[in-house]
Amino acid sequence: MTANRHQIATYLTDYALSELVKYVMEDTGCDIEQAMDRVYNSPIMPALQDEENELYVQSPAYIYELMQQ
């Protein structure tokens, strides 16, 4: 993976994570710490961090739907 592609993947993953935390907070009413715990410990997290499967290019809303399954 080129450095530029890695930077893009990192940026998109970080963006998706911040949106996922917001979605969890909105849907559950929990605080940011609890929301981050739910997102970072969810089964979808390893797939989101895997740059080869490119889940990070999907919309945060789609990733959130996957996280809820």
Where are the model-predicted features located?
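C-terminal alpha-helical interaction appendages
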Residues: 1-69
